[in-house]
A protein has these predicted regions:
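Aromatic/pi-system hotspot detector in well-structured domains
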Residues: 60-63, 70, 95, 139, ...
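Amphipathic alpha-helical regulatory segments at dimerization interfaces
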Residues: 47-51, 97, 105-109, 206-207, ...
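Per-ARNT-Sim (PAS) sensory domains and their PAS-associated C-terminal
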Residues: 6, 39, 43, 97-101, ...
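PAS/LOV and related PAS-like sensory modules
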Residues: 3-27, 43-57, 169-195, 202, ...
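PAS/LOV sensory domain surfaces, especially short acidic/polar patches at coil-to-helix junctions
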Residues: 65-77, 81, 194, 198-209
Length: 230
């Protein structure tokens, strides 16, 4: 076995690289961790850890009955103030505030079934206060050498900024619609060379109906009517 301890740091091939978190793993005191010493980790766990440490995408693995927690640099940003204390800790203690929300998903993964969740809203506490956050992620079972499920792997992308941006755009559009609807005179928004009506208030539609009716009654040639409101 080539696994040795150099200058207080583990020299284990599967722990190579990994940026700041990789360096922390190599220097970590694993006594008391539910994961035990890395030299005793099974090959299945070593493979997952080697993968996540050398990925730029946020990832973590929870292992064993106590769900010992390991992650990479990208996921450390999601943890916020929970990092670095979360390294090697218990999954349930790290994310205690959302445990009731995610435990059914974890249980499903530990039963051998993967799952995918898009823009899941959670109330997290990672900056010394509670905040809304949204995540798109997958939970996948990880099997030990004997084929039993020994842990779960997660690849996750925080979508909070995207969700909030979509909310702002939706809110701004609704304010514009309200402005149109409440305008004391007729108002419309047209687009393109055909003057397609993008938005119009009741006053405008009433005026347009009257104007069109007047043209038809006069039997004069009429310009091509504007396309319907979309």
């Amino acid at each position: 076995m080539t696994e040795t301890l150099l200058a207080g740091r583990l020299d284990l091939p599967f722990l190579s690289g990994g940026g700041q978190v990789g360096e922390m793993m190599r220097a970590h005191d694993w006594e008391g961790s539910p994961l035990g010493h890395p030299a005793s980790w099974p090959q299945s766990l070593r493979s997952v850890v080697g993968l996540l440490l050398n990925s730029k995408f946020p990832m973590f693995v929870a292992w064993g009955e106590e769900l010992g927690f390991l992650y990479n640099d990208a996921y450390a940003e999601i943890l916020g103030a929970k990092h670095p204390a979360a390294l090697g800790g218990h999954f349930r203690e790290i994310w205690a505030e959302i445990w009731d929300d995610i435990w059914p998903l974890i249980r499903t993964a530990m039963a051998g079934e993967a799952s995918y969740h898009e823009n899941l809203r959670l109330i997290v506490s990672r900056k010394d206060y509670d905040e809304e956050a949204w995540f798109t992620f997958s939970y996948s079972p990880v099997r030990a050498e004997d084929g039993t499920v020994a842990g779960m792997f997660c690849a996750v992308h925080e979508t909070t900024q995207l969700v909030l941006a979509e909310r702002r755009v939706s809110g701004e559009r609704q304010r514009l619609v309200d402005l149109f609807q409440q305008a004391p005179t007729f108002m419309a928004m047209l687009s393109g060379p055909d003057h397609r009506i993008e938005m119009a208030n009741p006053g405008y539609m009433t005026w347009w109906a009257i104007a069109r009716c007047s043209v038809e009654q006069s039997q004069r040639p009429c310009l091509t009517p504007w396309p319907r409101v979309i």
